[in-house]
Amino acid sequence: MTDPAGSAATAAPAPTDPAEVLAVYRSRREQMVVLPQGNLALVNTQWISHDADPQPVYGIPGTWSPLEPGVSGLRVRASADDGLRVDGVLVDGEAVVRGRDDPRPSSVVASDTVSAFVIASEEGAYALRVWDAQSEAIRDFGGIDAFPYSEEWVVEADFTPIEGGRAMGFEHLKDDGATKDKIVPGEITFTKDGVDYSLAAFREGRALLLVFSDATSGESTYGVGRFLMVAPSPDGTITLDFNRAYLPPCAFSYNFNCPMPPKQNRFAVPIEAGEKNVLAKDGTLLH
């Protein structure tokens, strides 16, 4: 049988030109945001406090309530007619939905298109995130607008580790000015066009997340700012390829609460590289 994807012998070689590599990356980004649990599929994030009464959650059946303090997850009550499945089992009565902070987080499926999972805050609160693979945002999505590739904004910087890291408060979009501490493991420094920069990025998985804004923010790019994943090299250097700057999840759904750029990460100059805005099919801004 012929492999519909083509054999290794006939597969097209991977692109090596930076602009072509970027085009492949951007195509994959547009595919990822429309996945069943991609950014555009998120229709609700509902926090349920420790002392809350059982309550409905928009977009999914059942009534939801907290577990005992210190126990990961939420409790749901539903009838078999609701069609709600937790870890593959139809709920007819009560079920415990383990949070993503548990070694074995629960899966929740309400229909062919609606799913959910429980997230935890750093303070130990829990919320249900509801995803709809046929959300209005997915139906209206027209693409991610972006700048052309810019060699100017591939910057070589120095990374100076901070022993033990430094706790730094980051404001978040929905927190009314309150900050959440993130550990910044080192300083990112470079000089460009005669200006010295010192940036702060916090750990996100195996890499560092740089949250920044610039003179394009709120003009030709998303107003809250943009993200850039970076990774220091063993020799103490770090490459900031702003062509890979991407829109934060909150640019796709109001149900995300994104960190905002600290003062030192707010560039006074325009960075005309990377993603710009989420577009609707008619070319207007989706949000």
What function would you assign to each model-found segment?
Residues 2-5, 9, 13-40, 44-61, ...:
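Hydrophobic, proline/glycine-rich low-complexity stretches
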Residues 26-29, 231-287:
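Long, compositionally biased interface segments
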Residues 49-99:
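Forkhead-associated
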Residues 62-67, 72-77, 113-120, 197-201:
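Broad, structure-driven detector of short, well-ordered beta-strand segments within folded domains
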Residues 89-117, 124:
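Phosphate/adenylate-binding glycine loop and adjacent helical scaffold
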Residues 112, 118-182:
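Surface-exposed beta-loop interaction hotspot
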